[in-house]
Amino acid sequence: VWSRTPRRGATWNRFCSNDTAVVYLRDGELICRAIATPQRLKGQEPKDFISGGIKSEGKFSFQYGRAEARIFTKPHNGNFPAFWMMPQDGSAGWPKAGEIDIWEQINTENVSYHTLHSHWTYTLKHKQNPTSAVQSHNIDYSRYHTFAVEWTPTLISWYVDGEFVGSAPKSTDSDVLANGQWPYTKPFYLILNQSVGDGSWAASPDPNFVYETRFDWVRVYQTKAQNPTLTAIARNVIAPLSPSQNDEDADDAVHKASLWYDLSGRRINNFNQGHGIVVNGEGQKMLLPAH
């Protein structure tokens, strides 16, 4: 489901590296770091910093639903981690193809940023017509928090620890839509990363500090009403689930409410304690670990 984020020219990925010092697993969590380039890499690494992240591009994307992650970060001047989404089809280019920032934090701020980027909001600078960004204040970053987005055809809403923060609606003005306000009509993939600022928003990094963000888990949900559009079911998608009844023995109501599949999406009649995907009475639920 995941691959490491490659180095490119944007602020967030200008230091990206495959080195295990900046993207690795520890105690079941994904650890993403940004650090001054280690001495062992001097001579082969042209940058003064290296940073880590992962993405599901080309492996997992979805259209409409809820995505959430449990995250811990270490605020410090220059900190710039993110949990966000980009379009699987990015042929229109950025920002026309759109961007959904589920969560960002910068520097030492106790704020969570939740933002949409599009041609309308970024290039034409209509950020409040309609609203395209909301914030949550007084976040205690000394502990873990769950950050979530809910995405429908006409509304994108953000949550922190299950509490509603705010929403960004699709405009009803045809001229606004014609100018690229709502490109959120196609599948998007997930990105989890630790970056550092360049002074334009987040401050420039401190070479003596180890920037670190921990991603405990990532989950994606879709309801039946959203006509589930998960575009990948990979064998390395792992989610612990409880046992179900045998198809032949199940009560009809239970049978309809609890259908089980293997990791390739195939129906299974006998399901013992283990891992899989559940489609229940509320819709389809797919759990993705950050590893």
Model-derived segments and spans:
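GH16 jelly-roll
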Residues: V1-L230, A234-V237
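C-terminal outer-membrane/trafficking sorting elements
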Residues: N236-H291
